[in-house]
């Protein structure tokens, strides 16, 4: 933890200001920097601002989504994927302490994605590009599902730092600021465009993020 935290604190000085940002994104970036510089990464998921933006926890509708997962034919897979860990000190779901509302929600989204087309095979998805990757939960779930998958997140530099911490602490191997690895975190729009053109086939994930893009 301390080694990763030290690396992130160093990288937090490299503020990325090229791409335009909405005021909400600016506030989020400032809050993340506060968390990093005050050595609170170990419990960043208890930060109220981070929860408001990234984390769904004790909401009743999550219970119904969990029930739907349990009734699904793929429940043996979902059961493994919803297991929560202690990275970031997440709030556990009050009706299932082995998971969190946010992780249940992310897995539920994957299930609905599968339901949208019978031709989709999760095991055959090799490349994913996610726009706005939260704190890295969806990426972690897909890596857990398939450790050979190529996963690239485009987000703000400061959010990339949060993602790097979360994924690194989950024993993933994220690359910060480049696309040389299997799990890449980038914040340069030009870099994203070049990378996307190289990948002929990929799964594109954007959970609300496209609507937040500055025009």
PLM region descriptions:
Residues 9, 13-120:
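Conserved Class I S-adenosyl-L-methionine-dependent methyltransferase catalytic core
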Residues 124-134:
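Conserved class I S-adenosyl-L-methionine
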Residues 125-126, 200-202:
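Nucleotide donor/acceptor-binding cores
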Residues 135-146:
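Conserved SAM-binding loop of SAM-dependent methyltransferases across substrates and taxa
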Residues 150-156:
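Conserved SAM-binding motif I beta-strand of class I
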Residues 160-161:
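Short alpha-helix immediately C-terminal to the canonical SAM-binding loop
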Residues 166-198:
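S-adenosyl-L-methionine
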Residues 202-214:
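A short SAM/SAH-binding and catalytic strip from SAM-dependent methyltransferases
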